[in-house]
């Protein structure tokens, strides 16, 4: 993790702790905080690498090795979560959506654009274009997180101002109305299992 990226992550942590009353990072400003950030980054990267390695092993016919890579990736995920919790990086859903939106904003407004400029200067125009294309995706991610956050802030997650088609994510039951039922009448799962149905096929 680069110094600049670490600095940006620290700023985001501070901003959201203040805004959403998240737990305080008792390690702030210490070498231990830097070590925790490095540990989180290292475990997160290892987890991703091992899932990629598992895909290769599976394609090559090594099912046991693929399973071991995936099992180890799950272990690394838990290690990363442990260090991220120590950094007080996990809040409630509202705080997490806001933090995610800020992270995506940094990626598309600063990080990928800076990476693209450097790639161009060093003679890698195709990579520069790819950095910018991924940056455009990160912009969409930010917009999605901000829309979801707005739904929570305006109490529009399970109730809309217009009639919608709601679908139970568990059993597929359909309800038409402005509000999802508090309990699915078919499978008895709670309202949290309902979403606005999207047909994109």
Give names to the regions the model predicted:
Residues 22-201:
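Non-heme di-metal
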Residues 1-21:
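Short, Lys/Arg-enriched N-terminal segments with co-localized hydrophobic residues
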């Amino acid at each position: 993790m680069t110094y600049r990226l670490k600095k940006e992550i620290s700023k985001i942590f501070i901003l959201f702790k203040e805004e959403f009353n998240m737990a305080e990072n008792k390690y702030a400003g210490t070498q231990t905080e830097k070590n925790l950030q490095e540990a989180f980054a290292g475990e997160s990267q290892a987890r991703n690498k091992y899932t990629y390695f598992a895909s290769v092993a599976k394609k090559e016919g090594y099912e046991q090795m693929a399973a071991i890579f995936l099992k180890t990736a799950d272990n690394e995920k838990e290690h990363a979560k442990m260090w991220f919790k120590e950094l007080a990086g996990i809040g409630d859903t509202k705080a997490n959506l806001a933090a995610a939106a800020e992270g995506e904003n940094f990626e598309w407004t600063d990080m990928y654009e800076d990476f693209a400029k450097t790639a161009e200067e060093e003679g890698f125009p195709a990579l520069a274009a790819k950095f910018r294309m991924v940056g455009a995706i990160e912009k969409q991610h930010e917009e999605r997180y901000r829309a979801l956050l707005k739904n929570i802030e305006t109490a529009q997650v399970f109730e809309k101002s217009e009639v919608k088609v709601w679908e139970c994510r568990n059993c597929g039951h359909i309800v038409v109305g402005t509000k999802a039922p508090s309990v699915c009448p078919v499978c008895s799962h709670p309202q949290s299992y309902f979403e606005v149905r999207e047909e994109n096929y």
